[in-house]
Regions:
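Rossmann-like S-adenosyl-L-methionine
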Residues: 1-168
Length: 168
């Protein structure tokens, strides 16, 4: 994978691989599924998901990361992924007007997602949502909103990407 200096990438490769494997397993993706990879960074989760999905749309605000994601899809010969340079909340508000997704994998920053994103997520009603977070407090806040919208938590799996530190 290509990673530019301003792009985000998990530095603990061994744990990241386990995290992505579990996320894809929990997403239960099939060849007919449309998957949104929100807050996609350099596209790693979406590229991994693309091997099982019909179509993947990665959304990321950092334009350099989107450039990396497109290159990463190309060098991995992935054809069923599209990357969009946009705020995930703004993108989902527009997307919810005309389209549906079967699966949304979201990996927002430590500050969590936005009410606009979460409300739009509730409008498109994906069958499955996988929420990856490094901020348990903001994840709990966001999940509370999703639960109020009709979703239920079926699994929770911690991964220690920063061993021997206070970071989750």
């Amino acid at each position: 994978f290509r990673i530019s200096p301003t792009s985000f990438y998990q530095i603990n490769h061994q744990q990241t691989e386990k995290l992505y494997k579990k996320a894809i397993q929990l997403a239960d993706i099939s060849k007919n599924d449309t998957v949104i990879d929100a807050y996609c960074g350099i596209g790693t989760i979406g590229i991994v998901a693309s091997k099982k999905a019909g179509k993947v749309i990665g959304v990321e605000l950092n334009s350099e990361a989107v450039s990396d994601a497109k290159i990463n899809a190309s060098i991995n010969n992935i054809k069923n992924v599209t990357f969009v340079n946009a705020d995930a909340g703004d993108f989902l508000v527009e997307y919810a007007k005309n389209a549906k997704a079967d699966v949304v994998i979201m990996d927002p920053p430590r500050s969590g997602s936005t009410p606009e994103f979460l409300n739009s997520l509730l409008k498109i009603k994906p069958d499955r949502i996988v929420y990856i977070s490094c901020g348990p407090d903001t994840q709990a806040r966001d999940i509370k909103m999703l639960v109020k919208g009709g979703y239920k938590v079926t699994a929770c799996q911690p991964f220690d990407l920063f061993p021997h530190t206070e970071h989750v």
